[in-house]
Curated annotation (Swiss-Prot):
Catalyzes the formation of 4-diphosphocytidyl-2-C-methyl-D-erythritol from CTP and 2-C-methyl-D-erythritol 4-phosphate (MEP). Keywords: Isoprene biosynthesis, Nucleotidyltransferase, Transferase. Belongs to the IspD/TarI cytidylyltransferase family. IspD subfamily. GO terms for molecular function: 2-C-methyl-D-erythritol 4-phosphate cytidylyltransferase activity. Pfam families: IspD. Its EC number is 2.7.7.60. The record marks 21, 28 as: Transition state stabilizer. NCBIfam families: ispD. Pathway: Isoprenoid biosynthesis; isopentenyl diphosphate biosynthesis via DXP pathway; isopentenyl diphosphate from 1-deoxy-D-xylulose 5-phosphate: step 2/6. This is 2-C-methyl-D-erythritol 4-phosphate cytidylyltransferase. It comes from Aliivibrio salmonicida (strain LFI1238). The keyword Cytoplasm does not apply. One of its GO terms (biological process) is isopentenyl diphosphate biosynthetic process, methylerythritol 4-phosphate pathway.
Amino acid sequence: MSSLSPLFITVIVPAAGVGSRMKADRPKQYLVLDGKTVIEHTIENLLAFPMVNTVIVAISDDDPYFDALSIATDKRVIRVSGGEERADSVLSGLEYVQKNTLSQWVMVHDAARPCLRHSDIAKLIEAVIPDHLGGILASPVRDTMKQANSDLSISTTIDRSVLWHALTPQLFTTELLYTALKTGLEQGLSITDESSAIEFMGYQPKLIQGRADNLKITQPEDLDLAEFYLQKMKKEINE
């Protein structure tokens, strides 16, 4: 990592979603996990990584929760207006990065992934920065994958050896990701993550294998598992 030490990276955290699948009284990023909200765990973990100098959080203008958090007063945390879709929120963050010339590289990380290991961030940076393009953390598919018909009968079994779960962070140059997202949105493309926007431009970002415990909290049962992983991480740090 020493060869990359002068480099600083801005992280964009899109957090304007409501997370309806959680069936909770508030967006999932504001649910309490091990004494803090999910998004506080996520942001504090990112800021603790030495190469991260700023975290930009894209939040709905009518969000009533974020400003009440202690993390909101951290000078390294910048709030911008989130959009209707993830891509709109990330683009809003990128516009701030460009306007203020914050960094050449940006990472995008899900607000609901609080269990990210610093070793995975370092692994991503080491693999991607020399490539001058970008890449994402990903996890190989382990289960047998089935393709379904509209009536939920099985159409076929898919070869899982070529399938990966896309995780975050996803790391790209600021200029490239800005161009890709702006172009994709203008063309009405379905942009499900940052890599897909880059792929639409004809590029092939790198897959860097990350830990499977970097889970995204999506369902109610994920909270207990995430709390277990967080406590395990704390125990390892203190040993």
